Amino acid sequence: MKRRDFLKLSGAAIASSVLRPAESSAADAPKRPGRRIDPGLAVFMSDLHVWGGGRRTFGPYPINDYPREHLDVAVNGILAMDPLPATVFVPGDISWLYGDIEDYRYVKPVLGRLEEAGVRLVLGMGNHDRRETFFETWTQYAETTPVKGAVVTRVDAGPCDFIMLDSLHQPEKVIQLNQTGPYVAGVLDDAQQQWLEAEIAKIRKPTYLMAHHPASQLKVCGRNLADIIRTNPNLPGFIHGHDHFWRLSYFGTKWESVWVRGDGKYGFKSPADFKRQLCLPSVSNWGDIGYVTCRIDGEGLLFESVLNDFYGVHPVPKEKRPRHWDAIRAEHNGLKCHMFHRPWAEVPAC
C-alpha cells in the first residue's frame, strides 16, 4: 500500500476513540507450522510510540499514523526471519506519549503475533510509558517482576543473561498534566537500585543490562551505573533506546586508554576500553527507523541494524523528502557491533 493511501485510510480510523490494528496485518506474515526457533538469535526493537486512540497531542507533536505502519513493517520483518529469534526485547516507549491504555490495547495484539509464532516477548518501560496502564494490559509482568511495582525481567540466553531494567521516572504531578507532558530523564527507583546492587554482587555469568535510558543517566546506590559496568568483569555491555539512533559508545576513555602501559609499551590500560554501549533505533517515530538483530554465541553478541527508513520529526511526501535522509538510511543499515562476554582478557602490547 502506498503511503498516501495508508494515510487516507487511517484518517478515517482517527475518528474512532479506540483503534484496532489493521485486520490484514495478521495475514502479511503468517505463522509457518513447525518453524524453528533459534535460541542463539534475538531482536531488539525500541521506541514504538504508537497512538491507539488516547490523548491526541503534546506541544508541536501531532497525532500521526506512520508509527502504526512502521510497527507492522517491523513485526512482519521479524516474522519473515527463518529461523525465528527466540526473544524480542522492547526497552520502552511503547506508548505514543502518555502511557494511555488505548495505546497499549492497540499494540498488544500486534506484538502478540510474535508470541503466537513462539517468540518470547520482553517489554520494558520508557519515559512515555505508564506502569499502571501497562500492568493492566500485560498483567503477567506485575506477577513475574523481581522488583514489586517495576517492570524488570531477567532472561537466560544460554551463554549470557540479559536484565531489562525499568528507568521510567513517573512523578505524578508531571505525568497527569496534559499540558506539561511526561518526564524525560531516566531513573531507577530505590527498590530497584537495591535489588540490582544485590544481583550484581551475585553475578558470575556474563550479564548484559538494558534500559530505556543510557547507563550514564542511571544511579545504583550512589554510584553511576556506567562506572559500575566499566569496572565489573561480569557486565560486558549495555543496550538502551530513547535517542532513536543507532549509536555506539565506550565505557572506557578511548584516547587515554592507549597510552603507555606499566612496562613502557603502548597498549590498553583497562579492559573497560572494550566495553560498549549500543543505542537502538526507533521502530517508528523519528531518526533511524527499524530494529536490531543479535546473534548470541559463546564468545559474545553480534548486533546488526535493520533500517526501513530515516526521517526527521515526521515523514514527508517523496517529492519533498530531503536527499540526505536516504543517504543516512543507507549508511546506517546493516551496521554491526560486537560485544564480547569477556572483554577484560589481557590485551597484548602494540
Residue ranges of predicted features:
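Extended active-site neighborhood of metal-dependent phosphoesterases/phosphodiesterases
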Residues: 30-34, 61, 100-197, 201, ...
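Short, solvent-exposed loop/turn elements at domain surfaces
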Residues: 50-56, 171-174, 286-288, 312-314
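N-terminal export signals
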Residues: 5-26
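Short acidic, glycine-rich surface-loop motifs adjacent to enzyme active sites
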Residues: 200-217
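A short C-terminal boundary segment appended to hydrolase-like catalytic domains
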Residues: 292-350
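N-terminal active-site segment of His-dependent metallophosphoesterases
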Residues: 26-102, 198
